[in-house]
Amino acid sequence: MKLIVSRSQISGCVHAPPSKSHTHRAFLLASLAKGESVVLSPLLGEDTLATLSAVKALGANVCEGDDRITIQGGNLHAPLPKGTVINCKNSGTSIRMLAGIASRLDGTTEFTGDASLCSRPMKPLLDALSELGAGVTSDNGCAPFTITGPVSGGDVHIRGDVSSQFISGLLISAPLGKADTRIHLTTPLTSKPYVDMTISAMKKHGVSVETIEDGYLVRSGQVYSSEDVQVGGDYSSAAFLFAAAALAGEIAVSGLDPADPQGDQVVISILETFGAGVVRDGENVTIRKAALKAADIDLANAPDLFPIIAVLASQAKGTSRLYGAAHLRFKESDRIMSTVLFLRSMGADISETEDGCIVTGPANLSGANVTTFGDHRIMMASAVAGLIADSTTTVDDAGCCAVSYPGFVKDMQKLGADMREE
């Protein structure tokens, strides 16, 4: 299904969608905790549903209710049924975190996914699990692969600059072992706020993580406690709403906790740096259109913001440099390439660098036929760009936003955007 976008002005109020990152962690930790946990207001997108399906397959009892998921955990320690297969669809978070958990369980688990997921790098994590003693089989360092456990713990070495999800997977699974687990990072950690989010979520369930000189220590003997978790709004998804307002109107977004550890909360300060009108009042953020000025933005710790920040930069006076996000080349698409491709097709003055892009603005954008490569963030960023284009923009895959923000098009229409699916 295609998305057709025409030039529009937007205004109004909308509630931020639930956080994808928090929902993944809530489902996983509830499944590992002994007792009943309730996850309130979760995001039920394609990625988080892949995680929920996986924890069911691994032994958790799940009951779906109105705006809540009840999980009876603690059964994942039982021997796994022979031939257990986990299909993580397109979810990198699911496969990377669940692989760590599978290494601690008694039995063999096979992991697979769609074509895109099966092309994404897993080798650093698979090598780390092998170092811990897991049986690992993989033809090329990607899915499909199998993990045979259980491993007890010990010292493990892993790169920190490929995916923070590798580190989160090792951390979440560590308390299941009989020995302490020390995670040694062999390169600097990128997207550290996502690891901090994992550590914060673990703490809420009664498990502490210690920082050591080159990584993290999780002591054995800790047990996850059951907890009810309220999932807050998602700054990563709200960034598309913010940018739309900064370019084409004024909107208020509610449900965004200023104390939330999400790294993508930095989008608010980025908008201020570009010169957008920003007003924060508790959990409400109002963004209004303003003349934007160029800025240099380090996205090492907030790489998911890259596509939409590039759209903003295309409308800022002067030359902006977005950098620090080389690991974006291993996302659902090569996100640096796909971002530059769609913006250039719309008339932006933009060029790739190894770890980001250089953009000179403001550009008069024209409508174009956009290829998303099945990437939800490219779909939403290009749709926002279409709001200020001189002619109609056609986005090739309207449905891929269901991965992280299923209600994106409806929310934009509510705000007055001329968008339709066909």
Swiss-Prot record:
<comment type="similarity">
    <text>Belongs to the EPSP synthase family.</text>
</comment>
<feature type="binding site">
    <location>
        <position position="165"/>
    </location>
    <ligand>
        <name>phosphoenolpyruvate</name>
    </ligand>
</feature>
<dbReference type="InterPro" id="IPR001986">
    <property type="entry name" value="Enolpyruvate_Tfrase_dom"/>
</dbReference>
<keyword id="KW-0028">Amino-acid biosynthesis</keyword>
<keyword id="KW-0963">Cytoplasm</keyword>
<dbReference type="InterPro" id="IPR006264">
    <property type="entry name" value="EPSP_synthase"/>
</dbReference>
<feature type="binding site">
    <location>
        <position position="163"/>
    </location>
    <ligand>
        <name>3-phosphoshikimate</name>
    </ligand>
</feature>
<dbReference type="GO" id="GO:0003866">
    <property type="term" value="F:3-phosphoshikimate 1-carboxyvinyltransferase activity"/>
</dbReference>
<feature type="binding site">
    <location>
        <position position="191"/>
    </location>
    <ligand>
        <name>3-phosphoshikimate</name>
    </ligand>
</feature>
<dbReference type="InterPro" id="IPR036968">
    <property type="entry name" value="Enolpyruvate_Tfrase_sf"/>
</dbReference>
<keyword id="KW-0057">Aromatic amino acid biosynthesis</keyword>
<comment type="function">
    <text>Catalyzes the transfer of the enolpyruvyl moiety of phosphoenolpyruvate (PEP) to the 5-hydroxyl of shikimate-3-phosphate (S3P) to produce enolpyruvyl shikimate-3-phosphate and inorganic phosphate.</text>
</comment>
<feature type="binding site">
    <location>
        <position position="331"/>
    </location>
    <ligand>
        <name>3-phosphoshikimate</name>
    </ligand>
</feature>
<feature type="binding site">
    <location>
        <position position="335"/>
    </location>
    <ligand>
        <name>phosphoenolpyruvate</name>
    </ligand>
</feature>
<dbReference type="GO" id="GO:0008652">
    <property type="term" value="P:amino acid biosynthetic process"/>
</dbReference>
<feature type="binding site">
    <location>
        <position position="20"/>
    </location>
    <ligand>
        <name>3-phosphoshikimate</name>
    </ligand>
</feature>
<feature type="binding site">
    <location>
        <position position="304"/>
    </location>
    <ligand>
        <name>3-phosphoshikimate</name>
    </ligand>
</feature>
<dbReference type="GO" id="GO:0009423">
    <property type="term" value="P:chorismate biosynthetic process"/>
</dbReference>
<feature type="binding site">
    <location>
        <position position="21"/>
    </location>
    <ligand>
        <name>3-phosphoshikimate</name>
    </ligand>
</feature>
<feature type="binding site">
    <location>
        <position position="92"/>
    </location>
    <ligand>
        <name>phosphoenolpyruvate</name>
    </ligand>
</feature>
<dbReference type="GO" id="GO:0005737">
    <property type="term" value="C:cytoplasm"/>
</dbReference>
<dbReference type="Pfam" id="PF00275">
    <property type="entry name" value="EPSP_synthase"/>
</dbReference>
<feature type="binding site">
    <location>
        <position position="165"/>
    </location>
    <ligand>
        <name>3-phosphoshikimate</name>
    </ligand>
</feature>
<comment type="pathway">
    <text>Metabolic intermediate biosynthesis; chorismate biosynthesis.</text>
</comment>
<dbReference type="GO" id="GO:0009073">
    <property type="term" value="P:aromatic amino acid family biosynthetic process"/>
</dbReference>
<feature type="binding site">
    <location>
        <position position="120"/>
    </location>
    <ligand>
        <name>phosphoenolpyruvate</name>
    </ligand>
</feature>
<protein>
    <recommendedName>
        <fullName>3-phosphoshikimate 1-carboxyvinyltransferase</fullName>
        <ecNumber>2.5.1.19</ecNumber>
    </recommendedName>
</protein>
<dbReference type="InterPro" id="IPR013792">
    <property type="entry name" value="RNA3'P_cycl/enolpyr_Trfase_a/b"/>
</dbReference>
<feature type="binding site">
    <location>
        <position position="164"/>
    </location>
    <ligand>
        <name>3-phosphoshikimate</name>
    </ligand>
</feature>
<feature type="binding site">
    <location>
        <position position="377"/>
    </location>
    <ligand>
        <name>phosphoenolpyruvate</name>
    </ligand>
</feature>
<feature type="binding site">
    <location>
        <position position="25"/>
    </location>
    <ligand>
        <name>3-phosphoshikimate</name>
    </ligand>
</feature>
<feature type="binding site">
    <location>
        <position position="20"/>
    </location>
    <ligand>
        <name>phosphoenolpyruvate</name>
    </ligand>
</feature>
<keyword id="KW-0808">Transferase</keyword>
<feature type="active site" description="Proton acceptor">
    <location>
        <position position="304"/>
    </location>
</feature>
<comment type="subunit">
    <text>Monomer.</text>
</comment>
<dbReference type="InterPro" id="IPR023193">
    <property type="entry name" value="EPSP_synthase_CS"/>
</dbReference>
